[in-house]
């Protein structure tokens, strides 16, 4: 009996440790992966199933330029006319974007991409650093604005459908496996160098399965003679709140440690590149009574002296 009890307790502890190491959704469903994945993560299952009838005709991977104005559903055939060339126009110093769409009826085990050189007729080229791309990943959401009124507050969960939507651009992931009957978009950006010579630069996005070329998507960048100043010189005022406390929790590092600052640096760089010039500083503990997942703590030391006066650092 004692052995049975010990065995049962051991199993319970093992299961508890297993789930303690995994992340869970807001409703408590285990995600099957670490609580704080750093390099990559598994997407949640899609509540909607692919249509056997629609996907039956897709026998090989299909790849085309899409539009940046559409969030393509993960398991629904994209409604677009196949396009192997797209043209982007921009000033020197401007960022221009495009979206490529991959959809496949069979598994693609090692989907990856790369850029060719981009040159104009005179031999001028755009630097490799001007281009970057990332897989668009899918996250779970619901019909937040179903009534069109844009209001928050209490609501009946059963009245709002859950769905996967294309949202984050994962620039960390360099290759991925794409299951059969799945759509996988790729976001492409060119930050035209301010030193670029005006003209038309031609190149391509190469989409591969391992080393096998699936499709060459041609891309033209039309560079204007006009110049956009560096983000630090913009008159544009961007003020997005930052949450250092969320960064420390996610990366599991001590607050305000060197590791914490290192984790924040690339995030702050992204904000600066977008024109952010404002730093968020919270003076009191739990302002707004901790409405956010990671409540804000005070960034100022409060000291009450023996004589009843206050000092702040």
What feature does the model see in each segment?
Residues 89, 101-119, 173-232, 261:
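Extended acidic/polar, glycine-enriched regions
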Residues 7-16:
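Bacterial N-terminal signal peptides
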Residues 88-94:
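Short, solvent-exposed loop/linker segments at the N-terminal edge
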Residues 1-4:
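Positively charged n-region of N-terminal signal peptides that target proteins for export
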Residues 23-82, 105-188:
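Surface-exposed binding patches on compact interaction domains or structured appendages
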Residues 213-304, 308-313:
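An acidic-aromatic substrate-binding cleft motif
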């Amino acid at each position: 009996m004692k052995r049975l009890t010990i065995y049962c307790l051991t199993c319970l502890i093992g299961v508890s440790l297993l789930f303690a190491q995994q992340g869970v959704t807001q409703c408590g469903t285990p995600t099957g992966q670490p609580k704080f994945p750093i390099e990559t993560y598994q997407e949640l299952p899609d509540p909607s199933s692919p249509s056997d009838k629609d996907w039956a005709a897709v026998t090989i991977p299909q790849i085309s330029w899409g539009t940046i104005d559409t969030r393509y559903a993960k398991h629904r055939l994209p409604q677009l006319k196949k396009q192997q060339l797209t043209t982007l126009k921009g000033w020197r110093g401007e960022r221009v974007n495009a979206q490529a769409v991959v959809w496949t009826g069979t598994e693609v085990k090692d989907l990856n991409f790369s850029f060719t050189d981009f040159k104009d007729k005179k031999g001028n080229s755009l630097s490799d650093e001007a281009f970057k791309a990332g897989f668009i990943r899918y996250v779970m959401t619901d019909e937040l604005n179903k009534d069109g009124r844009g209001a928050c507050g209490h609501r009946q969960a059963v009245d709002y459908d859950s769905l996967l939507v294309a949202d984050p651009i994962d620039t960390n992931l360099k290759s991925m496996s794409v299951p059969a009957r799945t759509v996988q978009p790729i976001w492409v950006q060119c930050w035209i160098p301010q030193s670029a010579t005006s003209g038309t630069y031609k190149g391509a996005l190469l989409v591969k399965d391992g080393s096998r070329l699936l499709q060459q998507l041609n891309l033209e960048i039309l560079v204007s003679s006009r110049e956009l100043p560096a983000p630090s010189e913009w008159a544009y005022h961007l003020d997005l709140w930052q949450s250092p406390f969320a960064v420390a929790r996610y990366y599991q590092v001590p607050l305000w440690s060197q590791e914490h600052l290192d984790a924040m640096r690339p995030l702050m760089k992204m904000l600066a590149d977008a024109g952010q010039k404002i730093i968020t500083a919270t003076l009191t503990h739990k302002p707004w009574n901790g409405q956010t997942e990671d409540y804000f703590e005070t960034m100022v030391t409060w000291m009450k002296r023996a004589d009843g006066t206050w000092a702040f650092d």
